[in-house]
């Protein structure tokens, strides 16, 4: 039996035990966005090391291991890499969609004037790199990879900002997070529209029916998360069979997730007041009215949080420290050769990220501010914005994902090398500039106004 005899809780707090000190620290560790970037970096280094070692053939073969099930005439067989890219990454896109909806409904994206700068800058950060890439690859085999240079990797960008600590103004952090959200949404649309196979409309219709059923369950008040995950898995199978990239299921379900809790704040207060009205004593055990009141209070506390917030808190650590490192291990491994680095596709990818991203983000942000469409957040100087724009050249996770849809074999390896090289150059350039700027940077203001 767990006791709280050694705990010294403050008034209004839950009692603690020795294990809580460890688990709470670990929970805080998991919640730090920068830590997931460090884990992702470690997985990338491991993948690159093994891919350029005597064990490279075995490492490559591992991800091609076929895995699947067969029930009668139904057969589902995929390589381990495909299961990660098409299956587990659906959870990643689900989390991205939850983040987008939370920010739009509850967060920084609620204020149109505040978000306008990020939207305009994100547009420039996608259009300019894409245009530069197409200019370099027009009529070439790599032309189909125009979507590779569009995204920004949130985890790595936040990880870089964490290295700078208090030198990073809150305005820059909000700007980059909002920009990354817009980037992610656009990248999702690119995958769904630009890199899908021929469509099986029957399978797609079955997937659409599944979404209608999920909507109906929500309207009826079904709150069992397991039921929704089971329905989501069935929809995923249908959409996967349709030819449209199945990760779009994660996006749609994430955007369909409610942002309002089932129990209102007022109702929660009433329920808690009822529980607190009981006099002290040993009357919480057994099948009693008091016990049922306590159970109702527990449910009310949980259901006051919106499904978006609960699912994000529940799944984000698993995605950040499980799915994304697995994705990096399965996809970031590529033989590093001079021939690969000077491949036209690799050079076009590097140009798009290292040059196109910062130029597009900075130029469009400046135009947005000068035309009055957008305003800069307090504390975000032009010098800081340029430094942040350099960091947006870190495409990594989404860029590798899109490259896997656009290319095969040697061209895919060249694109991966370009993505990795661009991520290194962009992170070093961005960190160097942000470190060089004074805390109250006004040096670039005169040049932009």
From Swiss-Prot:
Q: How does it sit in the membrane?
A: Multi-pass membrane protein
User: Which ranges does the record mark as transmembrane?
Assistant: 32-52, 87-107, 114-134, 145-165, 174-194, 202-222, 233-253, 318-338, 347-367, 382-402, 417-437
Its GO CC terms? plasma membrane
Listed Pfam families: Na_H_antiport_1 (PF06965)
Which cellular compartments is it found in? Cell inner membrane
Note whether Lipid biosynthesis occurs among the keywords: no
What main location does UniProt list?
membrane
Provide this UniProt record's keywords sorted from A to Z.
Antiport, Cell inner membrane, Cell membrane, Ion transport, Membrane, Plasmid, Sodium, Sodium transport, Transmembrane, Transmembrane helix, Transport
Concerning InterPro entries, the annotation shows: Na/H_antiporter_dom_sf (IPR023171), NhaA (IPR004670)
List the catalytic activities from the record. Na(+)(in) + 2 H(+)(out) = Na(+)(out) + 2 H(+)(in)
Q: Which GO terms describe its biological process?
A: regulation of pH
- At the top level, the lineage of the source is Bacteria
Function, as annotated, reads: Na(+)/H(+) antiporter that extrudes sodium in exchange for external protons.
Q: Which family does it belong to?
A: Belongs to the NhaA Na(+)/H(+) (TC 2.A.33) antiporter family.
The name this protein carries in UniProt is Na(+)/H(+) antiporter NhaA 2
